[in-house]
Every structure is written in structure tokens, then in C-alpha cells.
Amino acid sequence: MKKQRICIVGDGLSGLMTALALSKLESLEVHLISRKKKHFNDKRTTAVSAANYDFFNEVINKLDKKLFWPSKKIDLFYETNDQNMNFLNFDEDRKNLMYVFENDKIKNILFKEI
């Protein structure tokens, strides 16, 4: 049976995660187009929902759970010239609302698995 070919452009978190997830399907041949040189370190952090965290654990082999910081509480603020205003709060006793991680660490794992 001939495999369907898929091309993914971009080596950001979404492109890498998509490439890895699709590469696990035997009927697909996945190609990733990315930059040849990395000129900067990605020191950003990303937050994902509990469902996305579960998906990461499904797709990435032996994912180190210590790379993720679970959060059961979220407070959102906006800043004016003279004050900080809290405009939204989420608080959950039993389950995590989101998981925060450093982009570089997860991207390095994804590059190794692809």
C-alpha cells in the first residue's frame, strides 16, 4: 500500500508536535521543513490544558513529568498607569487547570523523537 505523504512547514512547537503525532501513523510519510540554523534560544514558556498535557504524554515517549509545572489556580490581571486590576480568577481544588513548560526543553525532546 502506498503511503500518503504529508509535509509540515515550521519547527515550532505546533509543527514538531504535529509531525511526531502523524509519524506514528503507519499509513503516512511525514516530511518536516525547518530552518537549518537556530540563531536564538527560545526562553519562552507555554501553558497547555490538561487534555493537551495528556496528549503530550501519549505522543512523546517517556516524557519527564518534572518538565511541567501543574497549576490549579489562575489569576489574570491588567495594568494601568496607577494600578493592577484583577479581572478573572480560576481556582480548582481537585484537578490541574493547566501545565506550564519551557519551550526549549520540550522542543529538544521533539527533535530527538522525530
Language-model-detected regions and their locations in the chain:
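Phosphate-coordination loops involved in phosphoryl transfer and adenosine-cofactor binding
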Residues: 3
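Glycine-rich FAD pyrophosphate-binding loop
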Residues: 7-11, 20-44
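N-terminal Rossmann-fold NAD(P) dinucleotide-binding loop
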Residues: 15-16
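Short, glycine/charged-enriched secondary-structure capping and boundary segments
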Residues: 22, 45-48, 90-91
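N-terminal FAD cofactor-binding segment of flavoenzymes
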Residues: 41-79
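Conserved N-terminal helical subregion
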Residues: 69-114
